[in-house]
Amino acid sequence: YYIGTNDRKTELFEGMWPLPKGVAYNSFLVKGEKNVLFDLVRVNTIDSYVQKINEIIGEGEKIDYIMINHMEPDHTSSIKSILEIYPDAKLVTNKKAVAMLNNFYEITDNIIEVKDGETLELGDKKYTFYMTPMVHWPESMVAYEETTKTLFSQDIFGGFGTLDGGIFDDQIEYDAHYHEETTRYFINIVGKYAAQALKALNKLADLDIQLICPDHGPIWREDPKKIIDIYTSLAKQETVDGCVVIYGSMYGNTEMMAEAVARGLSEGGLKNIKIRDITKTSNSYLLSDIWRYKGVIIGSCSYDNNLFPPMDYLMTEVSHQRMKNNYWGIFGSYSWSGGALKTLKKYMEEGKYDVLDTQLEIQGAATEEEMKKLIEFGKEMAAKILNK
């Protein structure tokens, strides 16, 4: 049974990532000889959660086991409240999560510790557990139920967005309403650990999976291979032939330069082009663009002899994500002393990025001749992307 809840009130996931479409906290109840809960919900949605449990097993009935696949508070902050209702429930989790249960909630009793590859028979169901460390916390694990061929995948295969009516992939328009939010979720939450995610996906590759139950986003029963392929592509950071131009401009001069660069990209034969104003766009979306586009051009004004602060913050985030499959281009502008281009060069060197040799720095507003150079700069990136 699906007993998850929707959260349309929280505006920022983890205090950072915008939730314009909200988020679902998925939880599952396996009813049988033993009643088993899989992961919980954030405490701010607990009232509707408990109501759903009661509707299925009846008020006064017991929960025998609570599976803790992932300790992040959006899945465990309700655990003390749930244990007050079901005090005899045993918690099933791994060694690292046992320590976290104590650290977060001072829970130390009634815990069954499982290991990688261990199978636990609970009533008429068998669950095999697989550790998936750093996807995206160190204690993360998944559980596979053999008789129904169901994978309880915690945050793996998850995405942003509430489940509005339909919960299964065959009940929704996934490509129209969820694909972008799944992509952004992966890049924002899991992206830094893409190598570990790919390792986890390979570890699970031999399982016969007919149903995927993630902790966020749609449940996959019709075409589970689709979300597996999407996550595999994201974990490999497979880019598309396109370019995102991200600029930081205080008074419009750097913006005009970015427009010239984009014109050059187009004249160079590139069709998939996106321009982003860093002052109006959350890093959540910018990181998602950078992850997916083969070409990335960063243009920034200088500020206090350094990089424009919003751009500096973005580049710090980029350096954390360990992106590897992009071509980069950089340009800077300044009024009386530089700083933007110098700092961008430093980020490029530290990240060992594949950056174009042409790196432009312009004082004040670009002249007609400098605009031509910016257009040529865009053409150079287009040729690199299209392998001309």
Describe each PLM feature range.
Residues 92-140, 196-199:
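Metallo-beta-lactamase
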Residues 30, 70-72, 143, 155, ...:
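Divalent metal-coordination and catalytic microenvironments
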Residues 33, 44-92:
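Active-site metal-binding motif and surrounding structural segment of the metallo-beta-lactamase
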Residues 38-40, 62-71, 91-95, 151-154, ...:
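Active-site neighborhood of phospho(di)ester-bond hydrolases with catalytic His/Asp-centered motifs
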Residues 163, 174-212, 217-218, 260-276, ...:
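FMN-binding flavodoxin-like domain, especially the glycine-rich phosphate-binding loop
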Residues 136-140, 156-191, 235-239:
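Active-site-proximal loop/helix segment associated with metal-binding centers of metalloenzymes
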Residues 214-240:
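Terminal amphipathic helices with adjacent charged low-complexity linkers/tails
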Residues 1-56, 142-145, 149-153, 254:
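Conserved beta-strand hairpin/beta-sheet module of binuclear metal-dependent hydrolase folds
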